[in-house]
Amino acid sequence: MEVSMTKKSISDTLRRTCLILAGSFIMAVNLKSFVRTGGLIPGGFNGLTRLIQEISVLLWHWEPPFSVINFILNAIPAVISFKFIGKKFTGYSCLMIVVSGILTDIVPSFPVTEDVLLISIFGGLINALAISLCLFANATSGGTDFIAIFLSEKYGIDSWNYIFAGNVVILGIAGALFGWDKALYSIIFQYTSTQVLHILYKRYQKQTLIIVTKRPEDVYEAIAEITNHDATLIKGEGCYSKQECDVLYSVVGRDEVNKVVNTVRKTDPQAFVNMIRTENLAGRFYQRPND
Protein backbone atom coordinates (compact mmCIF):
# COMPACT_ATOMS: atom_id res chain seq x y z
CA MET A 1 0.00 0.00 0.00
CA GLU A 2 2.80 2.42 0.94
CA VAL A 3 4.68 1.60 -2.28
CA SER A 4 1.54 2.30 -4.30
CA MET A 5 1.02 5.64 -2.55
CA THR A 6 4.69 6.55 -3.09
CA LYS A 7 4.45 5.79 -6.82
CA LYS A 8 1.28 7.86 -7.04
CA SER A 9 2.97 10.75 -5.23
CA ILE A 10 6.03 10.61 -7.50
CA SER A 11 3.82 10.42 -10.59
CA ASP A 12 1.79 13.42 -9.41
CA THR A 13 4.94 15.41 -8.68
CA LEU A 14 6.38 14.66 -12.14
CA ARG A 15 3.09 15.54 -13.82
CA ARG A 16 2.80 18.86 -12.01
CA THR A 17 6.45 19.73 -12.57
CA CYS A 18 6.26 18.98 -16.31
CA LEU A 19 3.10 21.08 -16.67
CA ILE A 20 4.74 24.00 -14.86
CA LEU A 21 7.95 23.79 -16.91
CA ALA A 22 5.93 23.68 -20.13
CA GLY A 23 3.78 26.60 -18.99
CA SER A 24 6.87 28.58 -17.96
CA PHE A 25 8.52 28.09 -21.34
CA ILE A 26 5.37 29.01 -23.28
CA MET A 27 4.88 32.12 -21.16
CA ALA A 28 8.50 33.23 -21.63
CA VAL A 29 8.34 32.74 -25.42
CA ASN A 30 5.04 34.61 -25.53
CA LEU A 31 6.44 37.54 -23.55
CA LYS A 32 9.52 37.81 -25.77
CA SER A 33 8.05 36.99 -29.20
CA PHE A 34 4.58 38.52 -28.93
CA VAL A 35 4.27 40.94 -26.01
CA ARG A 36 7.58 42.76 -26.49
CA THR A 37 7.32 42.71 -30.28
CA GLY A 38 3.92 44.38 -30.12
CA GLY A 39 4.96 46.76 -27.36
CA LEU A 40 2.11 45.47 -25.20
CA ILE A 41 1.68 45.65 -21.44
CA PRO A 42 -0.07 42.44 -20.34
CA GLY A 43 -2.17 42.36 -17.22
CA GLY A 44 -1.12 41.08 -13.83
CA PHE A 45 2.33 41.24 -12.31
CA ASN A 46 3.94 40.36 -15.64
CA GLY A 47 2.38 43.51 -17.03
CA LEU A 48 3.41 45.52 -13.98
CA THR A 49 6.96 44.20 -14.40
CA ARG A 50 6.98 45.27 -18.06
CA LEU A 51 5.60 48.67 -17.05
CA ILE A 52 8.41 49.14 -14.52
CA GLN A 53 10.96 48.11 -17.16
CA GLU A 54 9.55 50.64 -19.64
CA ILE A 55 9.52 53.42 -17.02
CA SER A 56 13.14 52.59 -16.11
CA VAL A 57 14.17 52.82 -19.77
CA LEU A 58 12.28 56.11 -20.11
CA LEU A 59 13.88 57.70 -17.04
CA TRP A 60 17.33 56.11 -16.78
CA HIS A 61 17.85 54.41 -20.18
CA TRP A 62 18.37 51.10 -18.39
CA GLU A 63 16.16 48.01 -18.40
CA PRO A 64 16.35 45.97 -15.18
CA PRO A 65 16.05 42.16 -15.48
CA PHE A 66 12.48 40.91 -15.78
CA SER A 67 13.07 38.12 -13.27
CA VAL A 68 14.34 40.38 -10.46
CA ILE A 69 11.37 42.75 -10.61
CA ASN A 70 8.90 39.89 -10.90
CA PHE A 71 10.39 38.05 -7.90
CA ILE A 72 10.12 41.17 -5.73
CA LEU A 73 6.53 41.89 -6.76
CA ASN A 74 5.45 38.30 -6.05
CA ALA A 75 7.06 38.07 -2.61
CA ILE A 76 4.10 39.31 -0.55
CA PRO A 77 1.37 37.47 -2.55
CA ALA A 78 3.43 34.27 -2.20
CA VAL A 79 3.54 34.67 1.60
CA ILE A 80 -0.23 35.23 1.69
CA SER A 81 -0.76 32.18 -0.52
CA PHE A 82 1.49 30.04 1.71
CA LYS A 83 -0.54 31.03 4.76
CA PHE A 84 -4.08 30.93 3.40
CA ILE A 85 -4.17 28.68 0.30
CA GLY A 86 -1.64 25.84 0.55
CA LYS A 87 2.05 25.05 0.98
CA LYS A 88 2.55 22.76 -2.05
CA PHE A 89 0.35 25.04 -4.11
CA THR A 90 2.58 27.99 -3.25
CA GLY A 91 5.76 25.97 -3.78
CA TYR A 92 4.80 24.94 -7.30
CA SER A 93 3.62 28.49 -8.02
CA CYS A 94 7.00 29.85 -6.94
CA LEU A 95 8.66 27.32 -9.27
CA MET A 96 6.56 28.76 -12.11
CA ILE A 97 7.51 32.33 -11.16
CA VAL A 98 11.24 31.54 -10.94
CA VAL A 99 11.50 29.45 -14.11
CA SER A 100 9.33 31.73 -16.27
CA GLY A 101 11.20 34.80 -15.00
CA ILE A 102 14.65 33.38 -15.76
CA LEU A 103 13.55 32.05 -19.16
CA THR A 104 12.09 35.45 -20.06
CA ASP A 105 15.52 36.98 -19.49
CA ILE A 106 17.47 34.38 -21.49
CA VAL A 107 15.11 33.11 -24.24
CA PRO A 108 15.77 34.91 -27.55
CA SER A 109 12.97 36.75 -29.32
CA PHE A 110 11.40 35.16 -32.40
CA PRO A 111 8.97 37.74 -33.85
CA VAL A 112 6.18 35.95 -35.72
CA THR A 113 4.36 39.02 -37.04
CA GLU A 114 4.49 42.81 -36.79
CA ASP A 115 0.69 43.15 -36.90
CA VAL A 116 -0.25 44.40 -33.42
CA LEU A 117 -3.85 43.19 -33.65
CA LEU A 118 -2.73 39.65 -34.49
CA ILE A 119 -0.18 39.84 -31.68
CA SER A 120 -2.91 40.96 -29.25
CA ILE A 121 -5.29 38.13 -30.17
CA PHE A 122 -2.88 35.22 -30.55
CA GLY A 123 -0.63 36.44 -27.75
CA GLY A 124 -3.69 36.42 -25.49
CA LEU A 125 -4.54 32.87 -26.57
CA ILE A 126 -1.00 31.66 -25.86
CA ASN A 127 -0.95 33.48 -22.52
CA ALA A 128 -4.17 31.70 -21.50
CA LEU A 129 -2.66 28.35 -22.52
CA ALA A 130 0.44 28.96 -20.39
CA ILE A 131 -1.61 29.95 -17.34
CA SER A 132 -4.00 27.02 -17.85
CA LEU A 133 -1.13 24.51 -17.84
CA CYS A 134 -0.02 25.99 -14.55
CA LEU A 135 -3.54 25.85 -13.09
CA PHE A 136 -3.93 22.22 -14.22
CA ALA A 137 -0.84 21.54 -12.10
CA ASN A 138 -2.73 23.07 -9.16
CA ALA A 139 -0.49 26.14 -9.07
CA THR A 140 -0.54 29.68 -10.46
CA SER A 141 1.71 31.92 -12.52
CA GLY A 142 1.87 34.29 -9.55
CA GLY A 143 0.76 37.85 -8.96
CA THR A 144 -2.91 38.48 -9.59
CA ASP A 145 -3.46 34.73 -10.05
CA PHE A 146 -2.68 34.35 -6.33
CA ILE A 147 -5.35 36.96 -5.64
CA ALA A 148 -7.84 35.30 -8.01
CA ILE A 149 -7.38 31.88 -6.39
CA PHE A 150 -7.60 33.38 -2.89
CA LEU A 151 -10.90 35.12 -3.72
CA SER A 152 -12.26 31.96 -5.35
CA GLU A 153 -11.29 29.82 -2.35
CA LYS A 154 -12.64 32.27 0.22
CA TYR A 155 -15.84 33.39 -1.48
CA GLY A 156 -16.50 30.57 -3.98
CA ILE A 157 -16.64 32.93 -6.97
CA ASP A 158 -15.16 32.73 -10.44
CA SER A 159 -12.97 35.83 -10.04
CA TRP A 160 -11.06 36.00 -13.33
CA ASN A 161 -13.27 38.72 -14.81
CA TYR A 162 -12.80 40.81 -11.66
CA ILE A 163 -9.04 40.46 -12.05
CA PHE A 164 -9.40 41.61 -15.65
CA ALA A 165 -11.09 44.78 -14.37
CA GLY A 166 -8.12 45.38 -12.05
CA ASN A 167 -5.69 44.83 -14.91
CA VAL A 168 -7.39 47.61 -16.87
CA VAL A 169 -6.07 50.03 -14.21
CA ILE A 170 -2.48 48.94 -14.97
CA LEU A 171 -3.16 49.34 -18.66
CA GLY A 172 -4.62 52.79 -18.04
CA ILE A 173 -1.35 53.88 -16.42
CA ALA A 174 0.58 52.44 -19.37
CA GLY A 175 -1.67 54.31 -21.77
CA ALA A 176 -1.17 57.62 -20.00
CA LEU A 177 2.62 57.19 -20.08
CA PHE A 178 3.32 55.49 -23.41
CA GLY A 179 0.30 56.06 -25.65
CA TRP A 180 -3.27 54.83 -25.73
CA ASP A 181 -2.99 52.74 -28.88
CA LYS A 182 -0.74 50.12 -27.26
CA ALA A 183 -2.80 50.26 -24.07
CA LEU A 184 -5.98 49.51 -26.02
CA TYR A 185 -4.27 46.66 -27.86
CA SER A 186 -3.10 45.39 -24.46
CA ILE A 187 -6.73 45.35 -23.28
CA ILE A 188 -7.59 43.17 -26.30
CA PHE A 189 -4.69 40.88 -25.33
CA GLN A 190 -5.88 40.64 -21.73
CA TYR A 191 -9.56 40.22 -22.61
CA THR A 192 -8.74 37.39 -25.03
CA SER A 193 -6.58 35.71 -22.41
CA THR A 194 -9.24 36.05 -19.68
CA GLN A 195 -12.07 34.64 -21.81
CA VAL A 196 -10.03 31.68 -23.07
CA LEU A 197 -8.86 30.98 -19.52
CA HIS A 198 -12.49 31.07 -18.41
CA ILE A 199 -13.24 28.34 -20.97
CA LEU A 200 -10.21 26.15 -20.25
CA TYR A 201 -10.17 26.30 -16.45
CA LYS A 202 -13.46 25.34 -14.78
CA ARG A 203 -12.53 24.60 -11.18
CA TYR A 204 -14.44 27.51 -9.65
CA GLN A 205 -17.42 27.38 -12.03
CA LYS A 206 -20.62 25.66 -10.92
CA GLN A 207 -23.20 23.61 -12.80
CA THR A 208 -26.69 22.62 -11.64
CA LEU A 209 -27.84 19.10 -12.51
CA ILE A 210 -31.52 18.16 -12.65
CA ILE A 211 -31.79 14.41 -13.16
CA VAL A 212 -35.01 12.49 -13.78
CA THR A 213 -34.26 8.85 -12.95
CA LYS A 214 -35.79 5.54 -11.93
CA ARG A 215 -32.76 4.71 -9.80
CA PRO A 216 -32.35 7.76 -7.52
CA GLU A 217 -30.36 6.01 -4.80
CA ASP A 218 -27.75 4.63 -7.21
CA VAL A 219 -27.47 7.95 -9.04
CA TYR A 220 -27.10 9.85 -5.78
CA GLU A 221 -24.35 7.49 -4.62
CA ALA A 222 -22.50 8.14 -7.89
CA ILE A 223 -22.77 11.92 -7.43
CA ALA A 224 -21.62 11.75 -3.82
CA GLU A 225 -18.68 9.45 -4.61
CA ILE A 226 -17.39 11.54 -7.53
CA THR A 227 -17.98 15.06 -6.19
CA ASN A 228 -18.54 14.73 -2.44
CA HIS A 229 -21.67 16.86 -2.96
CA ASP A 230 -25.16 16.20 -1.66
CA ALA A 231 -28.39 16.13 -3.69
CA THR A 232 -32.07 16.82 -3.10
CA LEU A 233 -34.69 14.20 -4.03
CA ILE A 234 -37.93 15.59 -5.43
CA LYS A 235 -40.99 13.45 -6.14
CA GLY A 236 -42.54 14.30 -9.50
CA GLU A 237 -45.05 13.18 -12.06
CA GLY A 238 -44.79 13.12 -15.83
CA CYS A 239 -47.32 15.56 -17.30
CA TYR A 240 -47.92 13.37 -20.35
CA SER A 241 -47.42 9.86 -18.97
CA LYS A 242 -48.96 10.63 -15.55
CA GLN A 243 -46.34 8.29 -14.10
CA GLU A 244 -44.53 9.10 -10.87
CA CYS A 245 -40.83 9.85 -11.19
CA ASP A 246 -37.86 10.83 -9.02
CA VAL A 247 -35.93 14.03 -9.66
CA LEU A 248 -32.47 14.63 -8.20
CA TYR A 249 -31.25 18.21 -7.86
CA SER A 250 -27.55 18.86 -7.25
CA VAL A 251 -24.91 21.53 -7.82
CA VAL A 252 -21.41 20.34 -8.78
CA GLY A 253 -18.18 21.82 -10.06
CA ARG A 254 -18.18 22.37 -13.82
CA ASP A 255 -14.96 20.37 -14.10
CA GLU A 256 -16.81 17.37 -12.61
CA VAL A 257 -19.88 17.46 -14.87
CA ASN A 258 -18.70 15.15 -17.67
CA LYS A 259 -17.60 12.45 -15.25
CA VAL A 260 -20.86 12.69 -13.30
CA VAL A 261 -23.08 12.59 -16.40
CA ASN A 262 -21.18 9.62 -17.89
CA THR A 263 -21.55 7.72 -14.62
CA VAL A 264 -25.25 8.59 -14.38
CA ARG A 265 -25.84 7.27 -17.90
CA LYS A 266 -24.06 4.03 -17.04
CA THR A 267 -26.09 3.72 -13.84
CA ASP A 268 -29.43 4.55 -15.49
CA PRO A 269 -29.35 4.64 -19.32
CA GLN A 270 -32.91 6.05 -19.32
CA ALA A 271 -32.06 9.00 -17.06
CA PHE A 272 -32.90 12.49 -18.30
CA VAL A 273 -30.19 15.01 -17.33
CA ASN A 274 -30.53 18.78 -17.59
CA MET A 275 -27.31 20.79 -17.06
CA ILE A 276 -27.67 24.47 -16.16
CA ARG A 277 -24.82 26.93 -15.69
CA THR A 278 -24.88 28.39 -12.18
CA GLU A 279 -23.86 32.05 -12.05
CA ASN A 280 -24.06 32.62 -8.28
CA LEU A 281 -24.33 30.32 -5.30
CA ALA A 282 -25.04 31.09 -1.64
CA GLY A 283 -24.73 28.54 1.14
CA ARG A 284 -22.43 25.64 1.90
CA PHE A 285 -20.66 24.13 -1.09
CA TYR A 286 -17.74 21.74 -0.81
CA GLN A 287 -14.65 22.84 -2.73
CA ARG A 288 -11.62 20.56 -2.92
CA PRO A 289 -8.85 22.43 -1.09
CA ASN A 290 -5.52 23.28 -2.71
CA ASP A 291 -2.68 21.32 -1.16
Where are these regions (language model features)?
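Positively charged, small/polar-rich N-terminal and surface patches that mediate targeting and assembly
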Residues: 2, 32, 60, 153, ...
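Core subunits and conserved enzymes of cellular information-processing
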Residues: 2-214
